[in-house]
């Protein structure tokens, strides 16, 4: 798991595993945002699996699936709301981290 810090309490990463969630909890993360649609890759865990594991550790989990190359206005608005209201530290992830970074930047405009 390679975390890229983009603000003091905001991080971006590539796909996380269910096993990473315990480590994220130990690091103090309070919120996870998944920007991958389910079934994008046959080897990725479904969001529901990530969410269930996150909740075991008291981590909030949100799903804003982005299908390249389009980021919808509603996705940006949802991200803006989460960034304003969700507890931090916060991690947003997708396959490589690129979609999460683009969505974050658009939400901060």
Task: Locate the predicted segments by residue.
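Cys-dependent protein tyrosine phosphatase-like superfamily
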Residues: 1-91, 98, 102-109
């Amino acid at each position: 798991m390679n975390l890229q810090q983009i603000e003091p309490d905001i991080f971006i990463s590539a796909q996380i595993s269910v096993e990473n969630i315990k480590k994220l909890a130990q690091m103090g993360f309070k919120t996870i945002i998944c920007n991958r649609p389910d079934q994008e890759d046959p080897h990725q865990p479904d969001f529901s699996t990530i969410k269930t594991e996150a909740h075991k550790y008291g981590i909030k989990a949100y799903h804003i699936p982005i299908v390249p190359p389009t980021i919808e206005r509603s996705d940006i608005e949802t991200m803006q709301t989460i960034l304003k209201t969700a507890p931090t530290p916060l991690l947003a992830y997708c396959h490589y981290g690129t979609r999460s970074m683009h969505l974050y930047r658009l939400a901060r405009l």
